[in-house]
Swiss-Prot record:
One of its GO terms (cellular component) is cytoplasm. Belongs to the KdsA family. Transmembrane segments: none annotated. One of its GO terms (molecular function) is 3-deoxy-8-phosphooctulonate synthase activity. It comes from Vibrio vulnificus (strain YJ016). It catalyses: D-arabinose 5-phosphate + phosphoenolpyruvate + H2O = 3-deoxy-alpha-D-manno-2-octulosonate-8-phosphate + phosphate. Keywords: Cytoplasm, Lipopolysaccharide biosynthesis, Transferase. This is 2-dehydro-3-deoxyphosphooctonate aldolase.
Amino acid sequence: MMEQKIVQIGDIPVANDKPFTLFAGMNVLESRDLAMQICEHYVKVTDKLGIPYVFKASFDKANRSSVHSYRGPGLEEGMKIFQELKDTFGVKIITDVHTEAQAQPVADVVDVIQLPAFLARQTDLVEAMAKTGAVINVKKPQFMSPGQVGNIVEKFAECGNDKIILCERGSCHGYDNLVVDMLGFGVMKKASKGSPIIFDVTHSLQMRDPSGAASGGRREQTVELAKAGLATGIAGLFIEAHPNPDQARCDGPSALPLDKLEPFLAQMKALDDLVKSFASIDIR
């Protein structure tokens, strides 16, 4: 059987054969107070359930569809909020970067820096992120086949960084729709020689409105999609939640209501424990 790589995020070992790690939080930093509220809730629930946890939020949504859409507080204010979250809750942080100049200042504060799906083939950005020495979460582009992720992992390795986590977030299926190929998780593992795979359930539920300026979504299907992904044996889940998804400033239609977080994660942990209790069956 293929050996599974372990990527350490501080004291958290992330691997496809380890108990699942949760990358989760809110889509974008809407305010300091809301970030504190959401992070505190995640920390309480994950501590109670014994789930390794990394808080996620964006400080700048640089790829919004409309020029009028909210982007976030920006780099300087965003890093201040992240540092306060770390100091207050002792939580690890993941956030995305969009330019080479952002890579090091962000890596100086957070624990994982994320390469956005739309930018995953940009070599200059890959090189800048690799040079920070940080753990990298690579969003697989919607236009890229699962087998092609090996090229991204190789590019980071050539730039001196092998601390790579891969994130599935769905593939384009015609116009304005995304689907998740459950066979793709195994292909990604093989193509990357056992890199940890995280499943971004929230963004896989996006469904664009061809006449609108923002994405729609199918949050009512969060549970079934997350269960299907975990059943393949992966390293973790990526989830966004909000106390009032209909009022969220980005991707509310795909966000999990915050009051559903504990029952949702309790089911996910039970399923992950069951799947990883099975002996491997090597079929050739």
